[in-house]
């Protein structure tokens, strides 16, 4: 039995909307990493809702626009000290790479996770970082935003030591 054309159109429109939403959420995650990698920390809070929340374990917490601005403001570059361009958390360089972004949608809300590899210089030393981002998303005024972003570290260790040790979280302590 052939499907009603109007019903088929509605079904296809819903599928296109879901694909568009998934792509917009991927773009949101990609923009976050672009801003980190390019040092555009002041732009990051705009990726969150006004009451957005950040939980980066021992690296810090922030809730609401004022706290998000303060948190990412701490990452803004400070004047060079002794020839090195340092930031207030002790990170003078960072490049992040994400993998396996999984998204679950329910209308104008969603959750997702992705895996992180990062190469920061922390307090003058090269580090290796592996972690998982756990996100909550919400669509507001046609745009997807982070409602909550969590970071679950797997390891944060000096490059010279590697991660084959019991204490795998050495950055930010």
Name every feature range the model reports, one short phrase each.
Residues 28-31, 43, 132-136:
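Short, hydrophobic/aromatic alpha-helical segments in well-folded domains
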Residues 37-40, 140:
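A short, glycine-centered helix-capping/turn motif at helix boundaries
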Residues 34, 58, 127:
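Short, charged/polar micro-motifs that form catalytic or ligand-binding hotspots
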Residues 15, 19, 62, 124:
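Charge-dense, low-complexity intrinsically disordered segments
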Residues 1-34, 38, 46-47:
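Short, low-complexity N-terminal intrinsically disordered segments enriched in polar/charged residues
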Residues 41-115:
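A solvent-exposed, acidic/Ser-Thr-rich amphipathic alpha-helical stretch
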Residues 3-13, 89-173:
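A beta-strand edge to alpha-helix "cap/lid" segment located at domain peripheries
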